[in-house]
UniProtKB/Swiss-Prot annotation:
PANTHER family: 40S RIBOSOMAL PROTEIN S11 FAMILY MEMBER, SMALL RIBOSOMAL SUBUNIT PROTEIN US17M
Gene Ontology CC terms: cytosolic small ribosomal subunit
UniProt-listed SUPFAM superfamilies: Nucleic acid-binding proteins
Oligomeric and partner information: Part of the 30S ribosomal subunit.
Source organism per UniProt: Colwellia psychrerythraea (strain 34H / ATCC BAA-681)
Protein name: Small ribosomal subunit protein uS17
Main function: One of the primary rRNA binding proteins, it binds specifically to the 5'-end of 16S ribosomal RNA.
GO molecular function annotation: rRNA binding; structural constituent of ribosome
UniProt keyword list: Ribonucleoprotein, Ribosomal protein, RNA-binding, rRNA-binding
Lineage: Bacteria, Pseudomonadati, Pseudomonadota, Gammaproteobacteria, Alteromonadales
InterPro entries per UniProt: NA-bd_OB-fold, Ribosomal_uS17, Ribosomal_uS17_bact/chlr
GO process terms (BP): translation
Length: 83
């Protein structure tokens, strides 16, 4: 069988006000199809933080998992740098 690649992303924690949950801002660079200018696009993802170790401004790695709740499909893997 073919192996599926596990999706992991890096981003900055912008909110940790929820219990065992964080909001991670993911930024990516995309090229405009007509004009060729590179633009920054961003996405906010909710992730599960079981031990509540993250604070705002932390650089973290998250991975995609089975749905935990209505809006949480990501889980915290590790904290790269603390704020």
């Amino acid at each position: 069988m073919s192996e599926t690649k596990i999706r992991t992303l890096q981003g900055v924690v912008v909110s940790n006000k929820m219990d065992k949950s964080i909001v991670v801002l993911i930024e990516r660079r995309v090229k405009h199809p007509m004009y060729g200018k590179y633009m920054t696009r961003s996405t906010k993802l909710k992730a599960h933080d079981e031990t509540n170790v993250c604070n705002e401004g932390d650089l973290v790695t998250i991975t995609e998992v089975a749905p935990i709740s209505k809006s949480k499909n990501w889980k915290l893997v590790d904290v790269i740098t603390k704020a």
